[in-house]
A protein has these predicted regions:
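Bacterial N-terminal signal peptides that target proteins for export
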Residues: 1-11
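Polar-face residues of amphipathic alpha-helices and helix-prone low-complexity segments
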Residues: 22-145
Length: 145
């Protein structure tokens, strides 16, 4: 049952991650964290006049993270039969948290596209915080699995 739920989550993430970007096979959790910290911080530097660039940058960062999450889900799925009950539960919980946090970041991305000038600063900060949370959770999950 848990395997079916994990696969369903992986499929949902795959659909959310179109188009997927290529993934480096050997990336440490620290490298991942640093790269994603830079992406989240970069969004904060855009002015409302640079909205299109900010959205493009945010989408690319989110797409890249989606691809890495999908790869992690595939790796977990490939090892599922070798995991004990505790590790399976942890994997399921990690993927569920990533899915929820990814959805939150996607909502902020939508807000970036449509925010008013007055709300721009709050929306940028909201996306950055949401993205940073997601990236941190991914780095932690990658390190655990």
């Amino acid at each position: 049952m848990n395997r079916k739920i994990l696969r369903a989550g992986a499929v949902a993430l795959a659909f959310a991650a179109m188009p997927l970007l290529s993934i480096a096979n050997e990336t440490s959790a620290k490298d991942v964290g640093k790269k994603f910290d830079e992406a989240g911080t970069a969004i904060k530097d855009y002015s409302v006049e640079q909205r299109d660039e900010a959205v493009k940058s945010a989408k690319a960062a989110l797409d890249d993270l989606d691809a890495k999450i999908n790869r992690l889900a595939a790796d977990i799925d490939a090892q599922w039969d070798k995991l004990d009950a505790s590790a399976r539960k942890k994997a399921y919980e990690s993927m569920d948290r990533l899915r929820r946090e990814r959805n939150d970041a996607a909502e902020w991305l939508g807000a970036l596209k449509h925010s008013s000038k007055e709300a721009w600063g709050d929306v940028k900060n909201g996306f950055s915080k949401s993205y940073d949370t997601l990236a941190s959770s991914f780095a932690k999950a990658k390190e655990e699995f």
